[in-house]
Amino acid sequence: MRHFFIALVLAATLISCGNSKNNNSATESDMPAFEQKFPQKSIWVPQDQNDSTEITFSSMEEAEWKLVHNVPHHDFSDAFVQVLLSDSSSMDYPFDSLSSENFCEIFKPVVSDDGNARFIGLKPDAAHQIPHMIVQYKNSGTVRIAKEEYPYENCFYCLTPDTVYTLNTGTSTLYLVWGYAGYTGSGNSYRLMAYELDNVGLHPASVFEGTVDINGGAEDGQSLETEICTNDELYNELVETDFRDLCYFNPKESAIYIRIAASKEADECGCSTRMTNQYQKFVWNGKKFVCGK
């Protein structure tokens, strides 16, 4: 039933938004890497299965923050974030206390004692999801997306780096975060999520036309989603390109391209979607991303 619904949604999308891009690649400038967007000591290190990973941020406010995620045996219930303040004091926050039940929802911000930073993150709700942590420095207004990737007990579920795109709206800055959104039972879901930084702070932004979300995207307009089967013939090719080929942002057009998953008869594994070489285009009109040429 779910795949039938997806097929209907996709069909409606292609009818109303028939402007797809037949292009299987994009230039490096179209797809800015994490390191290119946030080069100043925004360091992430993939971890081994039983080791911890430490990420160090150096801010302009003379504060050093260390985010330590301890995830033994892929049990995220034991994961925590340890914040070391400039006076050598520390604060520990378990993931459970920092996040909502839904991986896609943003949790209530935690403000550090000195008021310099807020910690905003997303909790994984299954073993095959990647936790995210967004660190906002209030004084400087800079935002860094910290991410970690964990090897799975089955290497078939390959790791996916997040990509962060930015768009200046004139009154605020939009952060478009592309990343792995979870295993659906027959395929992997990838989602583009929108956050806005304005004079109020950093918060989820409803900037996508809900009626044109593809493949199960959120109706609230805060994300776009696409899905790929783990046994798709294009799966290995996408692994080689870090899955950036699924979505990219063209700053010259202020447009997003998301690769379309086409529905077909379910195979022996029950998977009924296959990636195509077509992209659905969403153009920024000053207020939202809408289907367009």
Whereabouts are the PLM-identified features?
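Short aromatic loop motif centered on NTY/YTY
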Residues: 152-191, 201-281
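Sec-dependent signal peptide recognition
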Residues: 2-8
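Bacterial signal peptide processing site
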Residues: 18-20
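C-terminal motif of bacterial Sec signal peptides marking the signal peptidase cleavage site
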Residues: 14-16
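Beta-propeller blade signature
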Residues: 133-139, 190-199, 275-286
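Short N-terminal edge-element motif at the start of the domain
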Residues: 93-169
